[in-house]
Structure formats: structure tokens, C-alpha cells
Amino acid sequence: VQMFRLRRRVFRDRLDWTVSVSGDLEIDIYDALAPTYVLVVSDDYDVLGCVRLLSTTGPTMLADTFPILLGDKEAPRSELILESSRFCVDTDRAVELGPHGINRATFVLFAAMLETMRAKGANAIVTVTDVRMERILRRAGWPLERLTEPRKLGQTTALAGYLRDSDLALEAMYRQAGLEGPVVRNQPEGRKAA
């Protein structure tokens, strides 16, 4: 429940996106498709950040909600490619900054995404994001490979792209988060905690 509350605070309240809200929770149709949720949690088990990973062999946000961001390309459909969505960090609770002014929890969440991608046998993540997040990824050392040029969607300049599996990116996340190695701890089915 904490994760869905965080998503509402970030995507509806702060970013003012048009998202599905039920009470104080942000939940959409993709949450019903057995995604894997990757969470960054505090020592007290408060959710500090989250991201949703979904197989691209079924419905995805890129293919089914934002196909306009594909241009003339086909949506990725492969067991080797996951889709990430709903990436967010609670900057009110996770206040520790790492290099480049990026929140430390962001580096931990990026590392957990890479680890989870590998654990699922995938070699890439496709995502719909905005140009602000694209800059954060580049500064963090995990550059987004654009599918097409950005487009204005409402108040957001959005784009789609790939995040490839990379030893260099994973090492950069560990280093910038001040960690020695793996961050993922297995939790109940469909959830991973970092």
C-alpha cells in the first residue's frame, strides 16, 4: 500500500499527470498483470522508492498506452526485454544525495533494476520516461538509448528508450550508492526489496 501511496504523491500530486487514482492510491491496469515491483526500503521498512517491471510479451504502457512514442517502430516484444514504469523516489524521506546531486536511493533503485533484469534472464529494459529522467540516467552512468525523438505529451516532454544491461552501469550504481555489491533481497513473489 505504501508504494501505491508514494506513486500517487509523485505522479498525481507533484507531477500532475493524468493517472488512475483510487483514494490515496495510484493504481492502473498494468498492476493487474503480475508485474515485479522493485522497492527501496528503509531500515524501518518504509518505502523510499519503487519501480514496476513487466514482461514485454503482453500488454505494456509503451505499446498500449503510449504507442505515439514509437514513431514508425514496432513495440518491443521479447522475453529478453522488460518494461519499467512508475519509477519514483520519496525525496521527502530519502534525503541523502549521492554524486551529481542525485538521490542515493535512485542509485540503489537503478542497481536493483539491473540486478532484477539479470535475474529474470533479460538483457534490456524499455521505458517511457521524460527528458528530465533521461538526464538523470545519463549523469548516473546508465544512458537511455532513444527509440525516437521526444514528444510533448500534456505538460511533459516524453520519450521511449532502452536501458541495456551493462557491467559498467551496475558498477557505477554500486559505487555512487556507496555499496559493495548486490542490493536485491528476495521478497514474496513479484516483489524485490533493495
Residue ranges, per PLM feature:
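Acyl-donor binding region in acyl/amide transferases
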Residues: 59-61, 67-158
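Short amphipathic alpha-helix that is part of the acyltransferase structural core
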Residues: 1-24, 29, 37-41, 47
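Charge-rich, low-complexity intrinsically disordered segments
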Residues: 86, 151-194
